[in-house]
Amino acid sequence: MISNPSETKVSNFDDFSVFDVTPDPDELARKHKKPNDHGSVSIKELYRYAGFIDYILLIGGIIGAMAAGVLQPMQMLVMGDMMDTFDTSSMQNMDFSNISKAEQIEMNYELTASVADTINDLVLKMIYFAIGTTVGMFLMHFCFFVLSERQGIKIRMLYFRALLRQDAGWYDFHESGELTSRIASDVQQIQDGMSQKFGVLFQTICGFIAGYAIGFSKCWDLTLVIMAVTPFMLITVLFLGFFATKFTAKGENSLSDAGAIAEATIGNMRTVQSLGQEHEFADAYDKKMDSIKKYYILRAQVVGVGLGMLLFFMMGSLALGSWYGSLVIRGKGASKDCSAGTVMVVFMSVLMATMSIAQVAMPINALSTAQAAAYRIYQTIDRIPDIDCRSTAGLVPTECIGNIKLEDVQFRYPTRPNKQILGGLDLEIKKGETVALVGASGCGKSTTIQLVQRVYDPVGGKVTLDGNDLRELNLKWLRNQIGLVGQEPILFACTIRENIMLGAKDGETPTEEEMIECAKMANAHEFISHLPEGYDTMVGERGAALSGGQKQRIAIARALIRKPTILLLDEATSALDTQSEKIVQQALEKASQGRTTIIVAHRLTTVRNANRICVFHQGEIIEQGTHQELMDLKATYYGLVKRQSMEEEVDQETVENDLKKFREQEDKEAEQGILHKEESSTLESSDVVERLTKEYEAETKYLKHSNRFVLLRVLLNNFRHEWLLSFLGLIGGIGAGAVFPFYMIQFIGLLMTLMGMSPDVEPTTEQLHTVRNKCIWILLFGLAVFVTTYMYLGLFLSAGEKMIVRLRKLLYSALLRQNISYYDRKENMVGKVTTRLASDPTTLKGISGERVGNVVNTLSSVGFGVGIAFYYDWKVALCVMAIAPVLIVIVFLNGKLNSIQSSPATAAYEQSGITLVEAVESIKTVQSLTREDFFYNKFAADLKRPKKNILRWGPTLAFVSAANTFVTSCISAYSFYIGTYLIKKKSDYNMEFLPFTAQFMDSFTKMQKAMMSIMMAANSCGNLGQMIPDVGKAIEAAKNTFDVLDRKPSIDCYSEEGETFNDVKGEIEFKDICFRYPTRPDNAVLKGISFKAEQGKTIALVGASGCGKSTSIQLIERFYDPTYGDVLLDGHNIKDLNIHFLRSQIGMVGQEPVLFAESVIDNIRRGVPKGVEVSNEQIYAAAKMANAHDFISAMPEGYNTMVGDRGAQISGGQKQRIAIARALIRNPKVLLLDEATSALDSESEKIVQDALDKAAKGRTTIVIAHRLSTIQNADQICVIMRGKIAERGTHQELIDLKGFYYTLAMQQFGTV
């Protein structure tokens, strides 16, 4: 547990300087040029954050890759020597008439022994080459694994630090969802491009160069002829790289937009489901996915055509080379004394070099994707904001006096430059003075507070503190002098203790007693003490485990613990009940003494003791003075106060005594309930826990089954939906795999024909005919490989991209389907869920698309290769197959180890995603608390586990990958050894020499065909081994994906089941409702509540924060089901009703209204039930009813004005009015108002309240309100205390009762 966040330091993350991943972004930004403007960075820029150790690893990896690339074609030199060992063409013209048969038999034995000895020596050379290649492969895999993991962590941290650094103006143009999805997708793609795939690029390039170098050294003119088509191949490679990068960049931009939609909705599921907007958001997400699919399919087509063309040109070059090779052997070429072995070396080395180009598609694709992703990430990292919270520049005064002055301040929001918010504002606040800002919503009050914090800079004029322009002060010092409580308090997903401690100044360590004292001042200590875990209670995401009032009290305690010189209170008590408000208000007034305090409030009773009250109107101060002065003036302020007043006068002392009496009575009842709780609650709680656990297990009962055959499910999913593409791709993959084994048969036959030629003897007609036919066959194979490569790569890639897009759609849709309790669980926090949504489908490419095509191609190549080997020499094939299981075990061990390694890393990245989302979504709160370093360190701590795994897993994974190469090479060497041994064993030595050599050559030809087929099969298995790491990670991602897809929530918003009925009246009834949250089964929230709201009646729920009011509304919306009891709509149990039908009858306005990052009109239209059409005029009418039409129309773009991420571009009151309009456009039978007017100013509240009263006519309305003036006209008021209804009746009945409600009403309003 972190007792004091201010004690953490940035440097505490790294235990080893060798793994330091926290360079100073300022220094890096100065040292490195910014990326180019073409949507991708250069390779040099890609590695811009590499340190000394990283460059050592990069160089080591490149050396290893180059060694592996060079040594593989060099093995062809050994193959050529083997070929020359069997060359008997020089013996064809020898005269054997004078040699006895016994001597010829002796010659047979000598020839066989000589060949066997030579082969054995060459086999040893092959082993040596294999060892060298294996060392190179180990070095490549180890270095690039460690390098990519280190760089991935480093870039993640730099990107997160850059996000924490950016100012509010920048965030106004960027949705938080877009930014947070980048770290899950873009950084992973950068890491992927820096991984072993980058090493494979060097390996293939060096293999290409080495192959041609060997060719030139052995027979330069033959190599030159083969190279005649190289320019065409280079053009193809350039074409491939350019278009792959272009389409990748466009696709990734659309992916970021989709990520923003996902985060906005997943983070606000209550709003989405209450509006029944699951399908609409899913459709919007699907449109972004369709855009991605378009670009990725274009990329797939480019890759398929490009690689097919490369292989066609390669085959064409070999056909041309075969024809010219026959001339060289006959001495008619520029090079002389070229044997068949030399021609084979040239052919095989150039073939291997050219085939390496075919393998370049995957690393080029990964690299181009990484370069495009790096461009987007590095742009953010490079940006140094104008308001830089990390800057050490600026004045740091020795003390802060607290004199604030705004001189002719003009301000416009960056996203609305044509809309003036403040127009020449002049305001001076002296040390220790309390100034209240009042006025209509959107008039500039909260903007003024943001300018004092320097969240923004004014566009004209200046803001000064103690005579210093804020722009001249050190920003961190400035914000450390300020304590802020905002209108929508933000808590972080940690304990209550940590949340309060986050308010402490840098370098200060408040004691436990000081923290508790601040909680008491905020009237929070009592409710915290009643929580099972007390101050160690986790508050959930954005404080979701607490009520609005509880959150606000903790936020107040957080501000008080800072002991600030300046206190900013922006509607600090708006979410508090009357009882708490009075206590907290007194605490705030006490805390304000000696401090400069600025208060923004709509409840004017909270500002009457201010030294000065400033009345704002359209960005200007139209009245200012004390409360009494403004009341005497009888102008705007006077009218506002009158509208909030009641016509009763009370004795405040009596009220205080009554409140004290009720609190003591409540505590006494609680103490008396302890004995009963001890006797019965334990058994009850255990039963409830068991029941809730069983319900959760029922929802997830299919998950274990889904994980068993997840690989098969992905493949079948792909084939079922894209059967035509998959079928054609399957045929293409089988065909492409068959081409090279059959090509090798023709090639060996060609070599045998060439071995029979010599410069001294004219070739026979049959030999020339064979050479011509073989060249034609090779050219036909080239055409075949072009078609089949396009089919298996282009079509499988297209099918794979479609599958990934489809799975993204299904996964997002499944996430929208989950009930609210799913998101209450720690393992399903928004950050984790959005990280999975961004990364898991991308990782699934390891078992789809291109990978499936490559696997089919490989298995086909292996199958045909083994079949051909058995056909030509079954003994050789059988002997080699006997050791093949070793290679199979290594291949699958590689996959298993990669899956094991990726699982904890994935979990760590998901956990870091929670921190990222939490900080970015609440960036203004983070920066106002100067807690950037706290969240940075928290993020760094999340990444410790993958960091530690780097050295643990690097050598193991590299060893297994390198072992794959070694075993493949050993199989080739063993093939030659066993093949020669078998030829030696089965040869008939009692023959004359010439027949013996013919028999020997026939056996050799068959063995050669069998061995080359086996070698191609072994090489294919080796290539399969390089794909296995991605397969392991993809299977893990597939499990996560299908876990969500298979989960059946108990409250299924997609369900078509359930009753519907006509003529809905809207009668709501609670029958003995008991409720516990599934994640907190030990805490009983509602304890047997019963009430009935008849058609057209209004029921008000009042009570202290956390007593269960908002929970009741959530039960009506059926976000949860009651633990016991029933909720009825018109006598129907809502569990039996169709969920969409139920929610379409309800309009809800919440305490903290959520708007989406779209236009005003689109936000209002979100309230329209599915299948209903509304006109713009109806939308305008709803806005007028909510008193929103005038301010919307006054905006430069009117109803088309974008409200920003979570409505950040408009004020709290404006947001709430738009939310009310959104509820009214539904024309609901049941209206749920949870503090619906809490953020409105007095004038707007009166108008909106009248509108709501009018809208409530004919509708059943459930109202939650702390402002009791808003519920005076309710048909029934229920006072909830500790989960039970303590009092009920009309306003007058409860006043006459002179009970708790009466006391609250008198305490709240007092006298005027």
Swiss-Prot record:
GO terms for molecular function: ABC-type transporter activity; ATP binding; ATP hydrolysis activity; ATPase-coupled transmembrane transporter activity. Residues 404-643, 1068-1307 form the ABC transporter domain. Its EC number is 7.6.2.2. Pfam families: ABC_membrane (PF00664), ABC_tran (PF00005). It is found in: Membrane. The chain crosses the membrane at residues 51-71, 127-147, 197-217, 224-244, 302-322, 344-364, 725-745, 776-796, 852-872, 874-894, 958-978. ATP binds at residues 439-446, 1103-1110. Keywords: ATP-binding, Glycoprotein, Membrane, Nucleotide-binding, Repeat, Translocase, Transmembrane, Transmembrane helix, Transport. InterPro entries: AAA+_ATPase, ABC1_TM_dom, ABC1_TM_sf, ABC_transporter-like_ATP-bd, ABC_transporter-like_CS, P-loop_NTPase, Type_1_exporter. It catalyses: ATP + H2O + xenobioticSide 1 = ADP + phosphate + xenobioticSide 2. It is a multi-pass membrane protein. GO terms for cellular component: membrane. CDD domains: ABC_6TM_Pgp_ABCB1_D1_like (cd18577), ABC_6TM_Pgp_ABCB1_D2_like (cd18578), ABC_MTABC3_MDL1_MDL2 (cd03249). It is an enzyme of class 7 (translocase). Energy-dependent efflux pump responsible for decreased drug accumulation in multidrug resistance parasites. This is Multidrug resistance protein 3. It comes from Entamoeba histolytica (strain ATCC 30459 / HM-1:IMSS / ABRM). The gene is MDR3.
